[in-house]
Structure formats: structure tokens, C-alpha cells
Amino acid sequence: MFGETVQRASKTVHALRSRMGMVFQRFNLFPHRTVLENVMEGPVYVKGEPPKQAREEALVLLEKVGLSAKADAYPEQLSGGQQQRVAIARALAMKPEAMLFDEPTSALDPELVGDVLAVMRTLADEGMTMIVVTHEMGFAREVADRVCFLHGGYIVESGAAEHVLGNPQHPRTQDFLRRVLHPTGDTRSLS
């Protein structure tokens, strides 16, 4: 990871984790803290940044995800898409070198998915390394450099996004894409 061999129980695991951001399915925001406080939490309490500096950086990140006007709101006052964008800002506040996304749109209403994907697309355009678990095949095809298809905990197919998603070779990948891209049973070509 990051060019280093990592043993599961090694001391370098903690150091490597601090170089990564994580965005979960269910946002995991602190309900008793405002949006701004949620974004400031890690830099202040984990990294020891001065609160004034963390606040300024958090406001910049909230602007980046389109939520500067919600800085004083609490998570319960936000839509799911807004909460997920706060979660992205919170992860970015730790200045990660790479970000992990675990189904970031699966808990959202369909009309809110686009806002979250737009933020992720911006991160990709800025060069952020992202590992994304997703069923958003259009997004994966558009943004991913590489796609890995997992089944039963194992990678059954991997390669360039256009190859894996446009011309899958493994029967399980073909079946999955057929079901996701053609839920009505249309079995014509996937490309």
C-alpha cells in the first residue's frame, strides 16, 4: 500500500490508515455536532490542528461540496445526499492521499445520487486516488481507470473500465452486468 509491503499486525498499518479517507454507506456523522463541527472533528482531535485553522479549512471543504450554507445545520436537518457530501468533506479534512468509498450512493434516494457523484467526479478530476465499491456502473465506466469485479470475496475479473464493463470475459461479470444494465431481461450485447 502506497508502495510499502504491509503486514496485518505491523505498526505501519496505523500510519497508513492515517493517509486514507473513508466514506461509509450510512454517513456516520455525529448527530450532536453541526456540519462544520463534524468536518473539524478529525483535524482538531486526531491531528491536533488549532480550531481556528480547522474551521477555515472546513469551510473551504464545505464550499467545495456545495454545502457552505449548511455549516451550522445538524445532520438531521439535511437530506441523505447532503449528509453524504458532509461525510466526504469530513474525510477530505484529514488530507488523505487516497479515499475509500463503501457504496456511497446506496442509501440515497435516486434524485440525490447525482450530487454525490458530481463531488466524486470532481475529486477524480483533481487526481484523488479513490477505491469505490459501487453498483453505479455508468459512473464507474466514466470515472474509473481500473475496475475489479468481485464475487464471493475474490476478484474474478479486473482491467480497464471500458474492457471489464464493455466486454466482460468472466461469466459471473457478464451475468451481473446483464442484470444491472438490462433489468428487464434484455440479453443483447452489453456494450
Question: Residue locations for each model-derived region?
Answer:
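ABC family nucleotide-binding domain
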Residues: 1-161
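C-terminal boundary and immediately downstream tail of ABC-type ATPase nucleotide-binding domains
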Residues: 163-191
